[in-house]
Amino acid sequence: MYEVFADLHVHIGRSENGKPIKITAARSLNFANIAKECAERKGINIVGIIDCASPYVIEDIENFLKTGDAYELKDGGIIYKDKVCILLGSEVETSEKGRNGKCGAAHNVCFFPHLKDIKAFSNEMSHHIKNITLSTQRSDISGYELIDIVEKYNGILIPAHIFTPFKSYYGNCTDRLENIFKEKYDKIFAVELGLSSDTFLADEISELENKTFVTNSDAHSLPKIAREYNKMQVEDISFKEVVKALKNEDGRKIIA
């Protein structure tokens, strides 16, 4: 076992050929530059890029794998220059029946082991999102429905920045996550706290007692990568090992 650093929430601003992905993110924030920044400047061992369901980004990933600097792992993830494991993710905005019956919106980060999985996920989600090429567009499904689609393609779902007043579960949808996910709540084994909260706040909520807390950068530019990150204890860097750490299985865990 050894300790690694993981930032599981990094956006893409533009595709390699300049097509917009996250409008509010920097143009320099593309797939290849994120991998390079983590490997050469930030010392991040595992990075979750959460705009990989965009067909433009999928094309970039396919080209990235042809460079010879990266390859897919059997246990999930893409290894770049034997230094960084890239997790292929998608941030999805769900439509929830919020407090007092009003409609609310919440963000979820979903991760998949292999490129084929997120390609299939992207294809299915294109029926629920008007513009699948852009980042975090609102879907017409709830978190309760989304988790089934994510699992269908071997993925995991983490409710994102759960306390943020704008577009989060506790922020504008519900007082209890269990009210959203119902009998599927046990399938949620980790939550992202977000930049506006910490473990002291989260520890006050009883339904989060057995959930793993993660904190990430939500980077919209290269310098913002790793402004917040997680320290994990794992056997190696892969999708499978990250899932074990999030579940606190077999000695894998989030240390800080």
Summary of predicted features, one role per range:
Residues 1-102:
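An N-terminally biased module of ancient metal coordination in phosphate/nucleic-acid-related enzymes
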Residues 9, 51, 110, 157, ...:
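Conserved, mostly hydrophobic/aromatic
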Residues 11-13, 52, 89-95, 113, ...:
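Active-site beta-loop-alpha junctions enriched in small/polar residues
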Residues 16-19, 58-62, 167-175, 203-204, ...:
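Histidine/acidic-residue-rich catalytic or RNA/ligand-binding cores of hydrolases
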Residues 58-189:
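Extended substrate/RNA-proximal surfaces in nucleic-acid metabolism proteins
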Residues 156, 186-189, 208-214, 231:
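Glycine-enriched alpha-helix->loop->beta-strand junction motifs that scaffold or abut catalytic
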Residues 211-227:
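Short acidic/histidine-rich active-site segments
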Residues 237-256:
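Flexible inter-domain linker/hinge segments
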